[in-house]
Amino acid sequence: MKFAIKAVAASVILASAGGAFAQKGETVKIAWLDPLSGLMAAVGTNQLKTYQLIAEDFNRKNASGVKFEIIGIDNKLSPQETTSALRSAMDQGARYVTQGNGSGPALA
């Protein structure tokens, strides 16, 4: 019974959120804030390239017409730089943000 209630609630939420989903022909920009320079550059760059390859593969196979673009922004593994990188991501039109390395930048 509890499962059925949760399933109905989830369906109602998804049905009412139709305007929040990307439409055909739209590009969804996702900012990847991670160190792309300095000590952790190799890790951050590798993760960025992985996300970009996944997005490119999805874009080729995606029948819905929605495209995904991963924008890499260097946060230098610094909380202060992360807030600047977040502003830059918003200026570039990113609607979603993800971050990989470091709890300090993640909390910023």
Go through each PLM region and give its residues:
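Short, well-ordered amphipathic alpha-helical segments that serve as non-catalytic structural scaffolds
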Residues: 50-57
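Beta-alpha junction/loop-to-helix N-cap segments that form part of ligand/metal-binding clefts
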Residues: 27, 42-49, 61-108
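Acidic/histidine-rich, surface-exposed loop or edge segments in extracytoplasmic proteins
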Residues: 31-39
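Bacterial N-terminal signal peptides that target proteins for export
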Residues: 1-8
